[in-house]
């Protein structure tokens, strides 16, 4: 038998198989083998959206996540949330892994666990060509315009103004005098530092208010609860009010008060306007909170980076106040709580993702 016979069916099958593989390999860059290897090429051909944030158990971040989910669904593209659980190394590693998984075909909206984390995250994104928006935390010496076009924007709060506003509501509810205790977030977080500065500013304006103690509860209701229990034992009737740097800690404080039958008797304030805090204002157990609209942040952070990636927005042509800015807050008290509840708690918040600058409250100010 002649094994060199050109009509040998076995030889023809082998030649056809080789030609198919060679042809597929030569066209791989153009995506011609997508039908042969759909799983391998999914990341390259499909844009992915991702929000990176602290925790799904925190009501604020759960709402932030829903904002991201809604934006991705509106674009009919996949959404892959990343939860740091307050661990900087995990947050950075998860972003690095998602960049690799998507081959950089990614739009990212990140709340860095700590300010220092932002530097590593931004450098990773720039290297991979990933468009990114950051929320709250970054070093003061880093600016989006130095990393154009990939670092699209940084959104922050005027923490001092927000912290002072809720403190003022608390002090007025106390009649302008008496002792308070205060719960802070993570000491190195920009929001925590700013909000504490706001409390200090309010204390200077109300000389008859005495700060009995200040402790960090790391934004957590679970950590706030035993701290407030201890304060109630230590200070007793000296406590006339409780200031909290966020509402999750405020809910921990409120639970401690409920356990002693003091809910509603000792006024409490916080920040973030989570649903439980809004409900507590309605019942009179909570005095005030401030909304920074995490649903909007979760949506708009992705919308900004997506617009830059698709060419609808050129970050390099935008003024600095569109690259780093404070978001406009809303103070919630008994006077407007029902309207806020109807529009932002009972109903899904309305977000115009084409109005990039509608909630800009001004450029970020630095102390140094």
Go through each PLM region and give its residues:
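N-terminal secretory signal peptides
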Residues: 1-19, 26-35, 39-42
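Hinge/cleft segment of the Venus flytrap/periplasmic-binding protein
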Residues: 45, 183, 187, 202, ...
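Extracytoplasmic "Venus flytrap"
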Residues: 48-67, 71, 75, 79-94, ...
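Beta-alpha junction/loop-to-helix N-cap segments that form part of ligand/metal-binding clefts
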Residues: 85, 90-142, 157, 248-250
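Hydrophobic alpha-helical segments within soluble ligand-binding/sensing domains
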Residues: 91, 153-180, 224, 273, ...
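Hydrophobic alpha-helical
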Residues: 108-130, 199, 212-213, 217-280, ...
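Flexible loop/hinge segments that line or gate small-molecule binding clefts
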Residues: 121-161, 179, 274-282, 286-287
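Flexible loop/turn connectors
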Residues: 263-264, 269-332
């Amino acid at each position: 038998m002649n094994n060199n016979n050109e009509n040998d069916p076995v030889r023809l099958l082998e030649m056809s198989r080789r030609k198919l593989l060679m042809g597929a390999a030569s066209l791989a860059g153009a995506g011609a083998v997508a039908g042969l290897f759909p799983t391998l090429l999914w990341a390259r051909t499909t844009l992915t959206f991702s929000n990176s944030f602290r925790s799904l158990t925190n009501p604020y971040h759960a709402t932030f996540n829903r904002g991201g989910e809604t934006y991705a669904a509106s674009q009919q593209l996949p959404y892959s949330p990343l939860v740091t659980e307050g661990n900087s190394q995990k947050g950075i590693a998860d972003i690095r892994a998602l960049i690799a998984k998507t081959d950089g075909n990614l739009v990212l909206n990140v709340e860095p666990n700590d300010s220092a984390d932002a530097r590593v995250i931004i450098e990773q994104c720039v290297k991979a060509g990933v468009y990114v928006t950051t929320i709250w935390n970054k070093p003061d010496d880093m600016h989006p315009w130095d990393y154009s076009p990939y670092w699209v924007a940084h959104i922050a709060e005027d923490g001092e103004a927000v912290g002072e506003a809720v403190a003022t509501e608390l002090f007025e509810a106390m009649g302008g005098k008496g002792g308070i205790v205060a719960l802070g977030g993570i000491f190195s977080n920009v929001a925590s530092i700013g909000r504490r500065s706001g409390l200090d500013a309010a204390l200077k304006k109300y000389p008859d208010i005495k700060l009995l103690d200040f402790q960090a509860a790391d934004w957590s209701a679970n950590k706030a609860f035993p701290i407030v229990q201890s304060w109630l034992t230590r200070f007793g009737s000296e406590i006339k009010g409780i200031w909290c740097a966020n509402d999750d800690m405020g809910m921990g404080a409120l639970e401690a008060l409920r356990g002693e039958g003091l809910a509603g008797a000792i006024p409490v304030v916080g920040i973030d306007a989570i649903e439980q805090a809004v409900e507590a204002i309605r019942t009179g157990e909570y005095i005030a909170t401030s909304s920074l609209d995490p649903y909007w942040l979760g949506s708009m952070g992705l919308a900004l980076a997506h617009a830059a990636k698709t060419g609808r927005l050129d970050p390099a042509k935008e003024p600095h106040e569109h690259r780093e800015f404070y978001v406009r807050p809303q103070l919630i008290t008994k006077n407007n709580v029902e309207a806020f509840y109807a529009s932002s708690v009972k109903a899904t918040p309305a977000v115009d993702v084409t109005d990039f600058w509608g909630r800009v409250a001004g450029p970020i100010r630095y102390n140094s």
